[in-house]
């Protein structure tokens, strides 16, 4: 049973949220009721620049943080964290919306999972090829490894001179604690169905045969990374492989090598897209929007589960213990 204080806290928070949301609803452009309640799409469109040509808009989508599908949904406490499923939905909606003339991806990431990067890349490629909408990338402080992978199929790529990009390659890591365990007198008993069932186990060294197996996986994903750049940037495979040794590049260096089209910030990207479209459209930003359903769902979880945060931390730790292939730049 929840205590009286918890019920009062929930009611007070709900009243505050409803009042704040009502003010926001009145002062904002018209918004779909389903979206506001939280039963429809999970984003809102905010006008950031008003144009003189009406009818269509340019959409800005922000990708910030490690590209990883943590499985958690956005909440009041983690709206600043990257949410993979939510970003894919936003990208899909922007691609399908006939009122969106072009898309700008604001990218600031060291990369992340191979699968997650491939999912974003696929959607960007489909928008450019099937919808015939221009997709421009505006790189921030960092757009490395998976950050470059998802940018490769874009119509144009912009970066600041100081942007860190590149890091083209694949990495897979694990920790070997067998030596430490031996010093501490700890023994591990493993029963397995095949010789490679516990490959990359932390409790023993990797064998030569296992190194060969793992390297073939890394090489396969690396070849895919190279292909993505060849197709997206119109470069030869030889050119790409010379650049794709894992090193990082500044934005200026990336322009010189052909990995990036032009230097410039977000304002430059917006201006360039307007010129290429031949229209001064409104510029809108897609942002996650917490509706009433999201709020009450999150609040209920927190109140009914005292260990809610601990469960999230435990899930994250369990994920980090599992070696995965990554397009990730690790500083």
UniProtKB/Swiss-Prot annotation:
Single GO biological process annotation from the record: proteolysis
Segments passing through the bilayer: 7-27
GO cellular component assignments: plasma membrane
Top-level taxon of the source organism: Bacteria
Keyword Transcription attributed: no
Keywords: Cell membrane, Hydrolase, Membrane, Protease, Serine protease, Transmembrane, Transmembrane helix
SUPFAM superfamilies: ClpP/crotonase
EC identifiers of the protein: 3.4.21.-
Family per record: Belongs to the peptidase S49 family.
Role played: Digestion of the cleaved signal peptides.
PANTHER family for the chain: PEPTIDASE S49 (PTHR42987), SIGNAL PEPTIDE PEPTIDASE SPPA-RELATED (PTHR42987:SF7)
Subunit (UniProt): Homooctamer, assembles into a ring structure with a central cavity.
UniProt-recorded name of the protein: Putative signal peptide peptidase SppA
Organism for this UniProt entry: Halalkalibacterium halodurans (strain ATCC BAA-125 / DSM 18197 / FERM 7344 / JCM 9153 / C-125) (Bacillus halodurans)
Gene: sppA
